[in-house]
Design a protein with these regions (language model features):
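Short intrinsically disordered coil segments
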Residues: 99-100, 153-157
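Non-transmembrane functional regions of envelope-associated proteins
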Residues: 1-127, 165-229
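Active-site Gly/Thr loop motif
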Residues: 130-154
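Surface-exposed ligand/attachment interfaces on beta-rich extracellular proteins
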Residues: 156-165
Length: 229
């Protein structure tokens, strides 16, 4: 039950959970177990959202942190950028990917510093390229065939002990649904549909490997010029 799961999360000490944010709905203050993971208000340029759904208090209170998994596709349905900080309730809510990277580097959010708008964020000694809206544009890694871009294990193989010994040791482990059932959540990356946990993995990988795409300062005026033509 929830009590056993909460005890396991607390014992591990390295489990981060996700909240879901929406642009509509009734606003409510962040609960304390979410607010403790937040950063200072990132300003009006950051993505501002209206409502949120959080983990139940018994789990959120014992988690190492709670972050968001929000990613809004462009008009063509493709996900090209991910907000590393959302603006909600006058604070910056970090993405689950940012919390995972921060923890893997043995750092805290006190080590996160905003640089100039054109330079992004600095997490300890790691530079993370973002735009003024604190958006990361991952350099999407896509395998050349139908194979998964990142190693995957079924939950059943982990729980019953048939997963290879040590396969999770020293790794950032992301847990998420990867069903192909009709109606399952998916995002379009490049030319294919991927599950939200894969988008999360791409963001983590881009930050750790320094593979973010930097948008030059002249990109937006050029876009306007092309559209004007």
């Amino acid at each position: 039950g929830d009590a056993l799961l909460a005890a396991s999360i607390q014992r591990a000490g390295n489990v981060f959970l996700a909240s879901r944010y929406e642009s509509t709905g009734a606003a409510a203050p962040l609960p304390a177990y979410v607010r403790r993971s937040t950063a200072p208000d990132p300003g009006a340029a950051a993505t501002t959202l209206q409502s949120a759904q959080h983990p139940i208090p018994s789990l959120g209170a014992v988690a190492a942190g709670v972050g968001h998994v929000y990613a809004e596709p462009d008009n063509d349905g493709r996900v090209r950028q991910i907000p590393l900080l959302l603006r909600y309730d006058s604070v910056g809510v970090p993405s689950l990917a940012l919390l995972a990277v921060q923890h893997s580097l043995h750092l805290g959010l006190d080590d996160l510093r905003a640089l100039d708008a054109s330079e992004g964020l600095r997490l300890g000694g790691l530079n993370i390229p973002t735009n003024a809206g604190v958006m990361l544009r991952p350099r999407w890694q896509v395998s050349g065939d139908s194979a998964a871009t990142f190693p995957t294990l079924s939950a059943a193989s982990v729980l019953d002990g048939t997963a290879p010994a040590g396969s999770l040791k020293g790794k950032i482990v992301l847990v998420g649904e990867m069903t192909d059932a009709p109606g399952a959540a998916a995002a379009r990356v490049e030319e294919r549909l991927v599950h939200p946990v894969e988008v999360l993995a791409q963001a983590v990988s881009s930050m750790r490997l320094g593979l973010g795409v930097v948008e030059p300062a002249w990109a937006m005026p050029v876009t306007w010029l092309v559209l004007a033509l």
